[in-house]
Amino acid sequence: WDKVFEPIETFIAIPELDSIYKKVHRYQENTLDSIMYGSDSHKLEDILFEDYPDLLNRTDATHRKALSTNLFERYPEVLFSEKPDNDEYVKIWGRSKAGRLFKYLKAKYLRVHPNLFKYKVLLPKANGSGAIGEVLSTPLIGEPLIGHTQTFISIGNFNEKKEAENC
């Protein structure tokens, strides 16, 4: 009754594995999941649908703000192949039948994202067949003011381009 025990936190039945886990876990301050952003992390703002009410009926309310894989086909009137001279625009990476491509979207239509103003690495959400030894697609270095559709995931929230290149 007089003993003071530490909380278990993570139960591991094998003492040797428990010892290893505690040694390794102690040094985990920053993990990859703290800088990894899923394919559904970018969203459109309500002002897009206020400025273009015709877009409201192109999909259901649940998916309306998502930068879905078919974003370029769904909302072509607000996405441009060439950057217009007026207003501030962000580059959105996605995919079409022809392969990877980007389009420009007015910055006010994209919700601010944790890595929007930072460097990041863009990776395809799905990549190849999963065969061992298969060569994976070349990742893209995303500069500040670049977002992506659900075709990609992004890793990083870096201040310097070199950090993204080394990721």
Regions flagged by a language model, labelled:
Residues 1-151, 158-166:
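C-terminal substrate-recognition regions of SAM-dependent nucleic acid methyltransferases
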